[in-house]
Design a protein with these regions (language model features):
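Solvent-exposed interaction patches of small proteins and small membrane subunits
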Residues: 1-131
Length: 131
């Protein structure tokens, strides 16, 4: 449980930094690239928080991000709509790892406000549901 609390604190800082950049109306290329890196880190730390939460409080062993997302829906942490967006976010995260394409970076940056809101909601729901 201590590991989960530490990860939640990291997730809080990461999501806050993502939200800070995502709230802008437009970005320089450097800001956009920084925002994508913040997204990558925020996503990674948050799905791992959710994985720890599932293991500790629900006795569910989910190894992959997509499985963690689906299990979060099954137990009520994410709605069907949030799950759909989280799965898309997971796919986008995978693409950022394997590809750098200017067009994709522009498309992804347009989704950052929504992704930031979803990550914030997911984080708060995990915190709220913790005993």
């Amino acid at each position: 449980m201590e590991k989960l609390k530490e990860r939640l604190a990291l997730a809080e800082r990461a999501v806050s930094k993502l939200e800070e950049l995502a709230s802008k109306d437009e970005w320089t290329e450097v800001e956009r690239d920084a925002m994508i890196q913040r997204f990558e880190f925020s996503y990674e730390i948050l799905w791992k928080c959710a994985k720890d939460y599932l293991r500790v409080f629900e006795d569910i062993d989910a190894a992959s991000p997509r499985r963690v997302i689906r299990e979060c829906q099954r137990i009520g942490i994410l709605s069907a709509e949030q799950t759909e967006m989280a799965l898309r976010m997971s796919g986008d995260r995978n693409l950022t790892t394997h590809t750098y394409d200017e067009e994709f970076a522009v498309e992804l940056s347009a989704r950052m406000k929504d992704y930031g809101k979803l990550l914030r909601t997911w984080l708060e729901k995990i915190r709220f549901d913790m005993p």
